[in-house]
Amino acid sequence: MSDSAPVSGPDTEARELLEALVLTPSVAPDETACADVLVSFFEENDRTAFIDEVGNVRAPADDSVLYTSHIDTVPGEIPVRIEDGENGPELWGRGSVDAKGPLTALAIAAVRTGVSFVGVVGEEVDSRGARYLVADRDAPDAVVNGEPSGWDGITLGYRGIVSGRYICTSESGHTSRPEPNAIQEAIAWWSAVEERFGSNSPGEEENEETGPSVFERVTPKPVRIEGGISDDGLAVETTLDVQLRVPPSYTTDDVRELADGELTAGTVNWTDAIEPTMQSPRTPIARAFRVAIRGQGGDPRLLRKTGTADMNIYADAWDCPMVTYGPGDSDLDHAPNEHLELRELDRAVAVLEAVAEDLT
């Protein structure tokens, strides 16, 4: 077990790598330039690294634990700069929090401790990097997925997601007719779905004042709708794109079946599904993080996130313990004021080094 001393000063190497990565745009699917920066960092530190068929940066080594985070970011230009913040210097720029801060911390710790590393692509769009990775290699002994949790936070759970497209067609007619048209059918189906999932999920916690937590609920969201008279004027057509977030008390099949059960007209083409995950806080890797965070003077926080991450894909494919961890405030994900406190980065690197030393 590592007895790491609390960080006493800036981690210059980590801060320089973070700035280099944030200065290099990597909006999916154009991550190549940033991947090259990452490969160069590993090679400069005498580690073998390569870019695989889909664009992931692979640096295989000790598989006692795999450190992985994503290279890509969402769009949005934020001038890269360092500002003095309330808690010291902050690096501003797109991706500084989501997820080049975690990516940097994991890469630095992987080089210093000799554990395996992968920087994946496409997390913000289709998780093509993570999907390829689980198909291309065996499970490691443990996984740390990099996303912002705060240097003292450990994320154990994510909801899954189901995506689909509702399609309905009805005969055209005068709007005074009482029969529902395709647009009304779409509205009726979606209203029924929202009502269906307004009640508690099986086994979810109930609070008399606030009800079940968001993490424990299915949350349906319409994301796009189109409707109107067809080009030939003979029909009313509607398409409705939807997403439903899935808590661990459901499977994605459960949610699809329940949503399909509310259909009275039209059909749903389900296009994607990612299962939820809830990891145990009692695994060796979770314990190693608690010890390492306390070693840096922190009070470990165990987190559950209402979104979905690449850890969902790893958990569905690999039978090994895992957590998600990384510096940064996740409230700044995708935000116009995205920035990372650099002392967060320093502490996260120290935590990750201690975890790797504990597990190897």
Summary of predicted features, one role per range:
Residues W92-T104, E123-E124, P180-I183, H339-D346:
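Short, conserved micro-motifs enriched in small and acidic residues
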Residues L66, L91, D141-N145, S163-R165, ...:
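Short glycine-aspartate micro-motif
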Residues A20, Y132, I313-D316:
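Well-formed, non-transmembrane alpha-helical positions, independent of function
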Residues G85-P89, A109-V120, A139, E195-P202, ...:
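Phosphate-handling active-site elements
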Residues E43-R47, E53-G55, P60-V65, A110-S116, ...:
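Short glycine/proline-enriched coil/turn segments at helix->beta-strand junctions
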Residues S2-A99, D329:
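Acidic/His- and Gly-rich active-site-bordering loop/insert found
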Residues T104-S163, I167:
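Acidic/histidine-rich catalytic neighborhood of metal-dependent amide-processing enzymes
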